[in-house]
């Protein structure tokens, strides 16, 4: 995970001090790209322990088109709690946009189903794009999309994915985002009969919150360990049929977790 650690180091040393929506303060850079060959292991940060349960359940929640935290709460995942209303609702966030994007005529579009069908139909398409940035519904969202747009690319029987993330909380959020979209790439590849290529992560405002500096420095003192391996149940070929038990991460041997506050 050298690309991720390089980003941490660069922002600590060269980032610009900026104010932010949460009032915490950040150090940030604009425009950064990381590339991970998914054949070299599953890109899960090893210099601190990540909560795999949260990463997997959140992605499954997105893919079901859900926008209420009930499913997450039932599975001991708390990462969206701070933004939910009293009924557990978040408004038309990621799951709604991925599965039920509402156009100006009121017609809903299942972007993810279209994507799977189009990869099978026309793998050389340059239009294999999913967007969560539905301008007309942004005001209704509890949190506007940070990972806002992603594109797939097929060559030599391998599927690659590039994510554009407008805003990246480098210490807490970005490791989750890397793992989540790497997992999604594997799942889409299996659902379309392809192998995996690269995951490319492009960040707009890549920032460290001021109350994460010490934790980032601590993480940089640790030596990365071997990447784990992802195993998907080979019998699942429908992207929307994956369940938690169909996904296994083997050989994950991280350093201990490093706690840090979430900026809300």
UniProtKB/Swiss-Prot annotation:
Its EC number is 2.1.1.45. Pfam families: Thymidylat_synt. Pathway: Pyrimidine metabolism; dTTP biosynthesis. The active site is at residue 146. One of its GO terms (cellular component) is cytosol. It catalyses: dUMP + (6R)-5,10-methylene-5,6,7,8-tetrahydrofolate = 7,8-dihydrofolate + dTMP. GO terms for biological process: dTMP biosynthetic process; dTTP biosynthetic process; methylation. Keywords: Cytoplasm, Methyltransferase, Nucleotide biosynthesis, Transferase. The keyword Iron-sulfur does not apply. It comes from the Bacteria. It is an enzyme of class 2 (transferase). Its main location: cytoplasm. InterPro entries: Thymidate_synth/dCMP_Mease (IPR045097), Thymidate_synth/dCMP_Mease_dom (IPR023451), Thymidate_synth/dCMP_Mease_sf (IPR036926), Thymidylate_synthase (IPR000398), Thymidylate_synthase_AS (IPR020940). NCBIfam families: PRK01827.1-3, PRK01827.1-5, thym_sym. Homodimer. This is Thymidylate synthase. It comes from Xanthomonas oryzae pv. oryzae (strain KACC10331 / KXO85).
